[in-house]
Amino acid sequence: SQPWEPKNYDGTFDGPMPLKRGLAKSKNMISIRVLEAIGPPFAQQWVSRFGFEAEKHPPFLTMALGAGAVTPLQMASGYGVFANGGYLVAPRLIERITDHRGRVLQDSPTQRPDESMRVIDARNAYVMTDLLQEVTRSGTAARAQGTLKRNDIYGKTGTTNDSLDAWFAGWHPS
C-alpha cells in the first residue's frame, strides 16, 4: 500500500496561514492539523451529535477531508446545527400540503429547539458561521456569492480526488 500524502485541491502549498483563511481556501493541511490536535477518536465521538453515524466515520486523519459516509439529508442536518445557533433540528422537507381550494391537509410546524437538542454552545455556532461565511466571501465559494448577489450565504465546498465530484453544503437565513 502507498503512504497517504494529502494535497490541496489546487496542488499548491501556500505556507502557514490562519485557520479562517485556510478553511476558506480549502487548504487540507489546516483541517488535518486541527483533527490531529483534538484526535480522530474524539472527533468520531462528536459526529453523532451532528446527526452522522459514528461507525461510518473511521477515526483516522482522513476524516478531516470528508472520508466517511453521509446522506445529503444528514449533511443538511449537520450544517443546520450552525445555522440554528448550536441546536440539532430535524430538516423540514415539506412545510405544508394544501388541496386545490387552499385547505391545509397537512402542516409541519417549525420545530422549536429546546436545550436537549443543543449540540454546541451558541458562541461556537457563531464562530463556525463566521468561518463558513468567509468561504463564500473570499474563498472557494466566492463565485456563488457574486453570482447570487447575496452576502448572507454560509457553507463549505469540497472536491473528491482528481476533482471528479464537487459539492457545496451550506445555508442562508430565511
Region roles according to the model:
Residues Q2-F52, H57-N84, R123, L131-E134:
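Active-site-adjacent helix/loop patches that line small-molecule binding or acyl-intermediate pockets
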Residues A24-K25, A69-S174:
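A penicillin-recognizing enzyme superfamily signal
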